[in-house]
């Protein structure tokens, strides 16, 4: 069957949640039922509010089922010399179901995303690459981001 490439819409929310949970399972391992339920609940609300506004999901569909995704979250913040427009894109959830991997799906989705980000006048798109994804991102033109800052976070839990 032929794969269609498109931007996800609100009617795709259940598939987007399924793909996000599959990505989380692959990246973080199995979650407790309570954690999975909490994530699913947050995702439903998140997609209803943000999809098509500041979150754009590029999807590969086969037989009306999403088999690959790439999320682009737009972050707007005060400009500086590195992002004069104050708008950047963050890539999340580049994921293809196991049986469809190595068919160029992620690459096509990322190319769609890169083109769309340019139309949005983003200063750049950034991501955190897994070892498996790193060669693809390099091939697409992403560069290692040397930064003089140490990445840190403050966790509330």
Residue ranges and their predicted role:
Residues 100-112:
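Conserved acetyl-CoA pyrophosphate-binding loop and the N-cap/start of the following alpha-helix
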Residues 110, 117-129:
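Conserved GNAT acetyl-CoA-binding A-motif
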Residues 74-80, 84, 126-128, 132, ...:
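Conserved catalytic-core motifs of GNAT/GCN5-like acyltransferases
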Residues 1-14:
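Conserved N-terminal entry element of GNAT/NAT acetyltransferase domains
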Residues 24-46:
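Conserved GNAT-fold acetyl-CoA-binding loop/helix
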Residues 59, 65-74, 90, 95:
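Conserved beta-strand in the GNAT
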Residues 45-59:
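A short helix-loop-beta-strand connector motif used in the catalytic cores of GNAT acetyltransferases and
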